[in-house]
């Protein structure tokens, strides 16, 4: 999954064009001296301004363009725009944009309202690198991934025990810890389940 660009823009309804306050892009897919690199940078700026201008304050929106999704989040005229590949989860993208706006407002306060040009902001590059993995941006996605990994480990462990030549049926029969009623319940449940799978 790839984050191609992150931008922070001032979207003042009184001005025609949104002003780019900070931006970072990863155009490594194009060669260092490639003709397409400068064209793609212009494309990013054009699309970012267009999407930011059309994202009302307090709103979020996503626009799909070819293999990219452009996500925008506008908070009272301060708008974050992200260019991600199509596989980057939407929820993670908006979580990242929200965090970018929070940190920008903490760093600059309301001074952004008076800015009319792009300023270097190192955090944007840090965020682009750190959140390349969507689980870093979305804590629920991270928890889900950890649960999935735990489930895989549990399945491997159970399969490993059973793969040593022991079957669950023989373990139940040999068990002295299970009561006769529990053993009968296991056998009846197994018969019921096998009956249902044949249908």
From Swiss-Prot:
Assembly mode: Interacts with SYP41. Core constituent of the SNARE complex required for membrane fusion at the trans-Golgi network.
Mind telling me which PANTHER family this protein's record contains? Answer: SYNAPTOBREVIN HOMOLOG YKT6
Q: Disulfide bonds, which pairs? A: none
Concerning Pfam families, the annotation shows: Longin (PF13774), Synaptobrevin (PF00957)
**Lipid-conjugated positions (S-palmitoyl cysteine):** 195
Name of the molecule in the record: VAMP-like protein YKT62
Chain's gene name: YKT62
- Alphabetical list of InterPro entries matching this protein: Longin-like_dom_sf, Longin_dom, R-SNARE_YKT6, Synaptobrevin-like, V_SNARE_CC
Which SUPFAM superfamilies does its entry note?
SNARE fusion complex, SNARE-like
- The chain positions of domain Longin read 7-131
Tell me the SMART domains matching this sequence: Longin (SM01270)
Record membrane topology: Lipid-anchor
Q: Where is the lipid attached (S-geranylgeranyl cysteine)?
A: 196
Propeptide residue interval(s): 197-199
Species per Swiss-Prot/TrEMBL record: Arabidopsis thaliana
Cited function: Involved in the secretory pathway. Essential for membrane fusion mediated by either SYP41 or SYP61; triggers the fusion of phospholipid vesicles containing SYP41 or SYP61 and VTI12.
Q: What is its main location?
A: membrane
Its family? Belongs to the synaptobrevin family.
Annotated Gene Ontology cellular component terms: plasma membrane; SNARE complex
UniProt key word Membrane: yes
Every v-SNARE coiled-coil homology domain range: 139-199
Write out the entry's keywords from A to Z: Cell membrane, Lipoprotein, Membrane, Methylation, Palmitate, Prenylation, Protein transport, Transport
Q: Which residues are recorded as modified (Cysteine methyl ester)?
A: 196
């Amino acid at each position: 999954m790839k984050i191609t660009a992150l931008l922070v823009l001032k979207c003042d309804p009184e001005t025609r064009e949104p002003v780019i306050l900070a931006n970072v892009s990863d155009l490594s897919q194009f060669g260092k001296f490639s003709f397409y690199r400068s064209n793609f940078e212009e494309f990013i700026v054009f699309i970012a301004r267009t999407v930011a201008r059309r994202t009302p304050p307090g709103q979020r929106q996503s626009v799909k363009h070819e293999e990219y999704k452009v996500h925008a989040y506008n908070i009272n005229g301060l708008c974050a725009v992200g260019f991600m590949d199509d596989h980057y989860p939407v929820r993670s993208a908006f979580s990242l944009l929200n965090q970018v706006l929070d940190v920008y407002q903490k760093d600059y306060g309301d001074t952004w309202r008076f800015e009319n040009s792009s300023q270097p902001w190192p955090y944007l590059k840090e965020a682009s690198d750190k959140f390349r993995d969507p689980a870093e941006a979305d804590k629920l996605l991270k928890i889900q991934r950890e649960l999935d990994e735990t489930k895989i480990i549990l399945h491997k462990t159970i399969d490993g025990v059973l793969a040593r030549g022991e079957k669950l049926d023989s373990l139940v029969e040999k068990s002295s810890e299970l009561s006769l009623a529990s053993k009968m319940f296991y056998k009846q449940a197994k018969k019921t389940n096998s009956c249902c799978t044949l249908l």
